[in-house]
Amino acid sequence: MKYGFWLPIFGGWLRNVEDEQMPPTFDYAKQVIQSAEKWGFDTTLIAELYLNDIKGPEQDSLEAWSTAAALAAVTEKIEIMTAVRPGFHNPAVTAKMAANIDHISNGRFTLNVVSAWWEEEARQYGGIFTEHDERYERTLEFLDVLKGLWTQETFSYDGKFYQIREAKLAPKPVQKPNPVLYAGGESERGKQVISAACDAYVMHGGTVEEIERKINDMKQRRQATGQAPFAAFGMAAYVICRATDEEAQEELARITDVKESSGYAGYQDFINKSQLETQIQLRDYSVSNRGLRPNLVGTPEHIAKTILAYEKAGIDLLLLQFSPQLEEMERFAKEVMPLVESLREASHSLS
């Protein structure tokens, strides 16, 4: 199991808690990622939104790609997975930027490809936001251009959305043939595009049974393309680790006390502009990315056993959220991660 975390670029993950003591500043982000390296985390995921989806559109947030480049220069081991939304980017310029950050990081830069869901944000920032399936058609062409520029000495492309004429990109990325392309999606068209064009599949939080079904489905879809298996299956989850179940449940009740909040500004766009497999309740939206559904809430032993259940279902990358970030990441690294290893070893010795 690889342990990843979402970089706190929005000032937290809780829509019902105003101040989580984790400011959306570069200094705090740098402190978090450098500490995470010391504690044994493998990956960080930097979301790309120009408006703050957690605390409200009027609140501060960090821009993803400039933050990724800066953090690449002050870290040594951790994978820096950064979201990219084709409706906001020129693919040739994106290919160049990604190759550059891959060199800054010495091969640690990866992409999370997102076809976008927030129409109001696109309106404010001049992004291209068309009907659902067309967004995925654009994504497919976008990925064609990235891969072509990363792998061919001279590249031309004549598509519906993008035209490239004898373009050269040098230097190529450190990673061959390309930086890993992660993506998540639940619609039929989304799963088709991801199976055909991406390297790894990431999911919002879900129960073990939900996640196992999704993994099996995507494995079959990938096999049907004739390509190598997906490099990873990842899942988002929010962690509440406490000494007792009672303490953990008290914290859960506190953060899911739904209030009127500007942090819910994107809720209707998220459920209406996406094609979701799971019905989302307002309580689920209290925490980002359906993070409560995996139920990593309780004692270290409960959380460790639950992680092993997801590992058995096929998850090999967790993308975790914590609040407050530094304190809870350290607790997880010291109390949960070693316990997962010892429980796994004990299970193997019994078998």
PLM feature spans:
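An alpha-helical appendage that flanks or caps ligand/catalytic pockets
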Residues: 7-9, 38, 125, 132-174, ...
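Active-site mouth loops of central-metabolism enzymes
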Residues: 13-26, 83-92, 128, 175-186, ...
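Short, acidic/polar
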Residues: 23-36, 94-97, 184-193, 296-310
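Acidic (Asp/Glu)-rich catalytic clusters
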Residues: 37-38, 68-76, 98, 102-109, ...
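N-terminal beta1-alpha1-beta2 module of alpha/beta enzyme domains
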Residues: 1-74, 158, 174-179
